[in-house]
Amino acid sequence: MQHAHVIGLGKSGCAAALLLRQQGWQVELSDRNAVAAPPELVSQGVQFRLGESLDPVAWGWQTPEQRPNCIVVSPGVPWDLPGLRQAAEELQIETLGELELAWRTLSDIPWVAVTGTNGKTTTTALIAAIFERAGLQAPACGNIGFAACEVARQQQQGEAKPLDWVIAEASSYQIEAAATLAATIGLWTTFTPDHLNRHYTLENYFTIKASLLDRAQQQVLNGDDPYLRNQANATSRWPLAFWTSTQGAEALPTSRDRGFWIEEGWVIDRGDRLFPVERFSMVGNHNQQNLLMAVAAARLAGIEAEAIAEAMANFPGIAHRLERVATWQGIELINDSKATNYDAAWVGLQAVPGPTILIAGGEAKQGDDQAWLDLIQAKARAVLLIGSAAPLFARRLAEVGYSSPVENAETLDRAVPRAVELAQSLDASHVLLSPACASFDQYPNFEARGDHFRRCAQAIAKG
């Protein structure tokens, strides 16, 4: 029996372990932070090393009979961990990510794979909604929805209807560990500096993202993204790629016969009018960019315009991305917890109409904050800060001359009611959580942060 070692007890790691057991592997799972083994994995015969970091020497892997045939790595596990590098480089143990394992299981099914610094979650959800409206079995998975290995496990076990497509959101963490994933359609939404604590340089980050499109049969890129359009040499790297633009055909970096654009209020597919953009239920230019990317994927997959238009008109949006969670005395409270960097937070604040009380902060990331700070000066009546980034953000706001109130609320429990008070006194129409930060100083993930904000907001709305 072949032996696999899975690192990480999160959603992806558990799904990988169950898929491997279903395929007949002996599976051991480790997690240095976990203390309890999930009963559903124990019942399937998965073995555990909890509270331990990978250590090939201490675990006896130098003896060939003791070492695993492969290591499956969850997305949150850095690839430069000393023990992992030793296992992969010195002991020559095959090392792959959970998404790669799912691909190897489902490679006979066409995939749409979506990556990008920002916009990929909404675009992935839009694509899945369109495919569903068209009557296709095409679940969203990867960095959204199910873990990809859970989709693969259900398909292999016959627990779900046969798949027509797989719609995968792929983060840079997942792509770097998915060396053979070759999507039928690969999409790249945006590119700005992010995750540099993991990838170290912008060039490394770009190379990882680009590899997904290198292996895809067809590529779709956002022509409104300055980096992809002007600095990435993308038109020469992928000369047959399709491009999108909300600014009309003239703004495309390619010919019209490889373009999707908006013109005179219509969504255009390579010169053919599909439907009025006003049928799309979500607001904001960035969401029109996401819309065009999703339309391109759907049309390349052969889906008719009417199914696309119906899906667009009924799309509710996604949790934690400009999610309207409550209204109190005319003040809208909006959860944008997924805005984990400056660019995403700029997009969120820009999309909210009217004067706003902004809640920001968390675990700060590297990046250029100037455009975000400029927009705060223009739109925010006050800023409430939370988390470890609060002193940094307060200093930066002072440095750019922001003269409206800035308060360190420390936590959302304090920030949300105070934001509502300030909205009343300063005549602001919206309270927006758009942190521009990771969540890990106070929460396990951005979803938990957004859920907490939603509870706080709804408690106020209920009085």
UniProtKB/Swiss-Prot annotation:
Pfam families: Mur_ligase_C, Mur_ligase_M, MurD-like_N. Belongs to the MurCDEF family. GO terms for molecular function: ATP binding; UDP-N-acetylmuramoylalanine-D-glutamate ligase activity. GO terms for biological process: cell division; cell wall organization; peptidoglycan biosynthetic process; regulation of cell shape. Pathway: Cell wall biogenesis; peptidoglycan biosynthesis. The keyword Cytoplasm applies. It comes from Synechococcus elongatus (strain ATCC 33912 / PCC 7942 / FACHB-805) (Anacystis nidulans R2). It is found in: Cytoplasm. InterPro entries: Mur-like_cat_sf, Mur_ligase_C, Mur_ligase_C_dom_sf, Mur_ligase_cen, MurD. Cell wall formation. Catalyzes the addition of glutamate to the nucleotide precursor UDP-N-acetylmuramoyl-L-alanine (UMA). It is an enzyme of class 6 (ligase). One of its GO terms (cellular component) is cytoplasm. It comes from the Bacteria. This is UDP-N-acetylmuramoylalanine--D-glutamate ligase. Its EC number is 6.3.2.9. ATP binds at G116, T117, N118, G119, K120, T121, T122. Keywords: ATP-binding, Cell cycle, Cell division, Cell shape, Cell wall biogenesis/degradation, Cytoplasm, Ligase, Nucleotide-binding, Peptidoglycan synthesis. It catalyses: UDP-N-acetyl-alpha-D-muramoyl-L-alanine + D-glutamate + ATP = UDP-N-acetyl-alpha-D-muramoyl-L-alanyl-D-glutamate + ADP + phosphate + H(+). The keyword Cell wall biogenesis/degradation applies.
